[in-house]
Amino acid sequence: MSDDTNDAPEAPKTPAPLDPVAVVLLDHLATLPQDKSAAPDDVARAYAEIRRKPSDGRDLYKRYQRAVKEQAIHLARAGRIEILRRGEPVNPDDFKGVWRMRLKRS
């Protein structure tokens, strides 16, 4: 008797759904002119407005700053966006200080 488990075709890989912060980040960057970039605080504010409840304070966006950075790193590693320092793309695994982001240029 032969084992046919290796002959079965592989199921097509479906990309994992994006994190809601990543969706807002990509949507925000898509609205910018091609020569512009966004600060992480801009994206955190946009996401905070979606999540806002009447009892939330005006600094709600600060809760989401870390999530924005994590998703930006993830998207940069995947080649979907660029993380910029002084207007130049940087390694998403090794950057510090003030940074911005933009959609990956083709």
Where are these regions (language model features)?
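Amphipathic alpha-helical interaction surfaces
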Residues: 31, 53, 74, 78-82
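Short, positively charged loop/turn segments that connect secondary-structure elements
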Residues: 48-70
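Intrinsically disordered, low-complexity serine/threonine- and proline-rich regulatory segments
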Residues: 1-19
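Phospho-regulated, low-complexity intrinsically disordered regions of nuclear gene-regulatory
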Residues: 2, 14-15, 67-70, 77-106
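Positively charged, polyanion-binding regions of nucleic-acid-associated proteins
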Residues: 16-41
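Hydrophobic alpha-helical segments that drive targeting, anchoring, or assembly
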Residues: 34-47, 71-74, 92
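A generic structural signal for short
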Residues: 14, 28, 59-61
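Short Gly/charged-rich anion-binding patches and loops
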Residues: 24, 70-71
